[in-house]
């Protein structure tokens, strides 16, 4: 398990990826970085589903695909995935299949969150793998970025934290 400083460091990295996805591609600002047990970046990315016309190109999937290519392995054992928004069911199940060790997320997703908000797929005893979960790391910052993105898309003024 990493310490609070490491979790915040990597979450800030994920927030920067989310901001880049928003600024460069007008994507929903979600960023993810997959880190090895010894602190090496294995894969990272922001949401790409709008720009690539791919409903599966969520930030988590982008990061896991990059890590799988880098390691030449579909198993990502012992890794930690940092993501700015609680994963959906698709991403959560991909994490289980990849054998991710730990998930750290920023903002909860009360509509589609699958790490405890709506569903709790990651600790379901029916699966052959469980993932340690820590939520709320820099959650206010991530939530603010997401709310302002959607406010701007709806033609409303953004809100300063």
Give a label for each model feature.
Residues 23-26:
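Short loop/turn motifs at secondary-structure junctions and domain boundaries
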Residues 1-21, 90-161:
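Zinc-dependent deaminase
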Residues 30-39:
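Short beta-strand scaffold segments in enzyme catalytic cores
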Residues 51-62, 66:
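A short, polar/charged loop-to-alpha-helix boundary motif
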Residues 73-85:
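Immediate flanking context of iron-sulfur cluster ligation sites
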């Amino acid at each position: 398990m990493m310490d609070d400083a490491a979790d915040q460091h990597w979450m800030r990295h994920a927030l920067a990826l989310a901001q880049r996805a928003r600024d460069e591609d007008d994507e929903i600002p979600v960023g993810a970085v997959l880190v090895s047990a010894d602190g090496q970046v294995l894969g990272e990315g922001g949401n790409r589903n709008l720009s690539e016309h791919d409903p599966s190109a969520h930030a988590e999937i982008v990061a896991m695909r990059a890590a799988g290519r880098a390691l030449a392995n579909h198993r990502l054992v012992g890794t930690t995935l940092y993501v700015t928004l609680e994963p959906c069911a698709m991403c959560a199940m991909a994490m289980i299949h990849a054998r991710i060790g730990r998930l750290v997320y920023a903002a909860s997703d009360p509509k589609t969150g699958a790490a405890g908000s709506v569903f709790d797929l990651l600790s379901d005893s029916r699966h052959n793998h469980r993932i340690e979960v820590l939520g709320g790391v820099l959650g206010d910052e991530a939530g603010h970025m997401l709310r302002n993105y959607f406010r701007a898309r709806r033609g409303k003024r953004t809100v300063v934290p």
